From Swiss-Prot:
Residues 9-68 form the Sm domain. This is RNA-binding protein Hfq. Keywords: RNA-binding, Stress response. InterPro entries: Hfq, LSM_dom_sf, Sm. It comes from the Bacteria. The keyword Secreted does not apply. GO terms for cellular component: cytosol. It holds the Pfam family Hfq. GO terms for molecular function: RNA binding. RNA chaperone that binds small regulatory RNA (sRNAs) and mRNAs to facilitate mRNA translational regulation in response to envelope stress, environmental stress and changes in metabolite concentrations. Also binds with high specificity to tRNAs. It comes from Thioalkalivibrio sulfidiphilus (strain HL-EbGR7).
Length: 80
């Protein structure tokens, strides 16, 4: 598993579990808002008044409405 996946999953999982509202910016500039309902290797299910399946390759940026506390894997902890 790559480092990108190692960081991506805990980040999306924290957003999902804590029901943190997010803004998702797509590569074409469109802004989507809602809460992460679920995700897998290829898609994110975003819930607002409706549910939207957003393909990860179309996502540029995910911006949480508040700071997210991540449980970092040991191999990614900063060294002293």
């Amino acid at each position: 598993m790559s480092k990108g996946q190692t960081l991506q999953e805990p980040f999306l999982n924290a957003l999902r579990k804590e029901r943190i509202p997010v803004s998702i910016y797509l590569v074409n500039g469109i802004k989507l808002q809602g809460q992460i309902d679920s995700f897998d290797q290829f898609v994110v299910l975003l819930k607002n008044t409706v549910s939207q399946m957003v393909y990860k390759h179309a996502i540029s940026t995910i911006v949480p409405s508040r700071p997210v506390k991540l449980a970092m894997p040991e191999d990614m902890q900063p060294e002293d």
